[in-house]
Structures are given as C-alpha cells and as structure tokens.
Amino acid sequence: MHVAVFGGTFDPPHNGHLAMCLLARELLHIDKVILSISNNPFKLLRSDHDDHRKNMVGLLASELKKTELPAEVSGWELQKKTPSYTVELLRFLRTEYPDVQLTLLVGEDSYREFPLWKSYEELVLLCRIAVFRRVPPEQIAHREQRLEMIGNVRFIDFDCPISSTTIRADIASGRPVTAKIPSAINRYIIDHRLYRD
C-alpha cells in the first residue's frame, strides 16, 4: 500500500490542494492520502479557528473520496501542546503504518527550505518526498514526462496559481472564490463567516 502524507495549514483548503492529491494518485499510484493539519511551531495555543480548519479539511477529504481516493484527516499535530515538526509527524505515522510506503507531498517553496527543516536527514529515511514544482502550463504540455525521480525525491511538474493567502484576501474584500475552492468548503466559509476581517 502506498500512502501520501499531505500536511499544511489548510487555511482554507482549496482546489490546488485537491489537484495535488489527484495528480499524486495518477503519477505516484497513491492508494490513500492522509491530510495532516499543521500548527504554526511558534503558536502553542489552540483556537476555535483550528476546529474550523479541521472541519474544512474533512470536507476536502470528502471531495477526494468522491473521486474514489481514500482520504483521512489527521489532527495529531493540532493536539500537540508543544511545537510540531514534519519529522515528528512522520515518526508517528511510521508507527501507525509500519508496512506501507509513505510519500510526503510538498510544494516547491517548502522544498527549497528543506535543509533548514528539523532532522531533514531523517525524513528521507522515513518516507519518499514528492515535490510539486511550479511549471508554466505551456511547458508542461510540451514535456513528455511530468515526473522526474532523483534518489528518494520525486519532482512533479504542477501549475496552480491558487493560494490560501489570496483566497483569504479575496473573501475579506468581497471577491468571489467559487472557482478556487470546492463548493462544500465555500458554503462552510459563508455559513461560519470566516475570513471576513
């Protein structure tokens, strides 16, 4: 079994997150995705907004299940009372899933800072890493292969201009975001009046 681990703040989850998971299934033959809601390592107090993030990630998992990709939400990092780091999450998941292939999904920006991550050398022993690198769509269309492998790291060409930061700004400014987030998450944001200020 091949399990992808996709961590993030998911504030909010959006169509880019959905597309990354589906592309990972297509190119890496993923059987299941674990969506781990990350804490800011410098913010130790939980807030009501963490519950909203967890609920929205649950809706993202439901969207993935509609495509027949099993998805599970992990709140392990949110429950910790100490700063959480990716290597700790992977150690935990390795005990939960001792006999599966784990692949960590990361964006290109995060991967550039990889040598600064806590115990980054151990990470490549605990899992494979799939890096979604930004490539303009016209370049993707002319490449024979969207997947490149170097050692334990897979580089996947990916073009998605959507970001949680711009979605929050759009909502605060009253601009529509229906093309950027799944409809169930959009409804949740409206119902709970999130990102209004």
Swiss-Prot record:
It comes from the Bacteria. The keyword Transcription does not apply. Its EC number is 2.7.7.18. It catalyses: nicotinate beta-D-ribonucleotide + ATP + H(+) = deamido-NAD(+) + diphosphate. GO terms for molecular function: ATP binding; nicotinate-nucleotide adenylyltransferase activity. GO terms for biological process: NAD biosynthetic process. Catalyzes the reversible adenylation of nicotinate mononucleotide (NaMN) to nicotinic acid adenine dinucleotide (NaAD). Belongs to the NadD family. NCBIfam families: cyt_tran_rel, nicotinate (nicotinamide) nucleotide adenylyltransferase. This is Probable nicotinate-nucleotide adenylyltransferase. It comes from Chlorobium phaeobacteroides (strain DSM 266 / SMG 266 / 2430).
